[in-house]
């Protein structure tokens, strides 16, 4: 389903395709974590610093990097946990390490995001890029997240499958052009980590709300990520099962802020929307399907202190 706004009679602007808004932390899987894992920089249980840090470059150089609820926990945390709590400090550290390893500030965009249809923009190379400062559309985010759900393969979103004339002759037929962006191993690690984001509920109550509406639907294998921007001007939630990816953005057209309950409203809206679709067609979400780790992924016991 495509919902471009609250009331088409009042406003015909399609927010799903045309509204360009800052992605907030919802960009982190595609820009930071996926590329870092693919490059061999880290694994899901590697440790990253969440100690207080300051911006090194840009107009905010010397100012503290701020997480949603603190200026750092002054600890090290696993990569998985840093995604669960959406640590801006940890994500920035990973992004900087990726720069140093690959020697290119545009590495993540050139090798990954550009292949998933994200718009070209100088801000992808900013130190603050992991905080989601680049404007994207809901369609961009849906396409990006479905790449992980599709074993690392990007399939461009489309609406029209085919067009036929009155005689039944096919005038147009959509042709898929899949692009392998991430390896199957990386994609499976990312879905495993994003499952923790939804299950642990440190940034969204979506899991509880959807489970309360329908137990079977709540027990689907949900993975996803949240995002918000300054003053809650933008609130994002993108979720996937092995069958479908759904993205949600909410905010004001005039870019004014909202309030700290924005994430709760987004979780509620998404849960109720998904439940309504599910009650209409229970096959859509593949509630009995599960994401599996690729056979190429190696499991090992790691130290809680060193990763």
Q: Where is each model-derived feature located?
A:
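A generic secondary-structure signal for well-formed alpha-helical elements
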Residues: 39-43, 55, 90, 98, ...
């Amino acid at each position: 389903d495509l919902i471009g706004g609250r009331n088409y009679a009042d406003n015909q602007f399609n927010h799903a395709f045309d509204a360009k808004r800052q992605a907030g932390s919802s960009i982190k899987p595609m820009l930071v974590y996926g590329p870092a894992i693919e490059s061999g920089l880290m694994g899901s249980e590697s440790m990253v610093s969440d100690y207080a840090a300051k911006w090194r470059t840009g107009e905010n150089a010397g100012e503290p990097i701020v997480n949603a609820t603190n200026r750092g926990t002054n600890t090290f945390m696993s990569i998985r946990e840093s995604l669960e709590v959406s640590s801006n400090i940890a994500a920035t550290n990973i992004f900087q390490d990726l720069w140093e390893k690959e020697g290119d500030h545009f590495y993540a965009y050139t090798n990954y995001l550009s292949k998933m249809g994200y718009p070209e923009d100088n801000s992808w190379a900013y130190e603050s890029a992991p905080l989601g400062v680049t404007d994207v559309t809901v369609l961009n985010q849906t396409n990006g997240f479905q790449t992980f759900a599709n074993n690392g393969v990007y399939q461009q979103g489309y609406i029209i499958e085919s067009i036929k004339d009155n005689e039944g002759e096919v005038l147009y037929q959509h042709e898929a052009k899949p692009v392998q962006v991430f390896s199957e191993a990386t994609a499976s690690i990312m879905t495993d980590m994003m499952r923790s984001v939804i299950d642990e509920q440190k940034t969204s109550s979506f899991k509880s709300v959807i489970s309360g509406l329908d137990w079977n639907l709540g027990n689907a294998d949900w993975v996803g990520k949240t995002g918000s921007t300054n003053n809650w001007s933008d609130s994002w939630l993108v979720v996937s099962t092995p069958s479908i990816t759904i993205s949600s953005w909410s905010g004001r057209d005039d870019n004014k802020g909202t309030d700290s309950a924005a994430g709760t409203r987004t979780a509620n809206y998404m849960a109720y929307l998904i439940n309504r679709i599910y009650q209409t067609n229970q096959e859509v979400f593949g509630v009995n399907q599960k994401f599996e780790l690729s056979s190429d992924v190696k499991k090992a016991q790691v130290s809680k202190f060193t990763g």
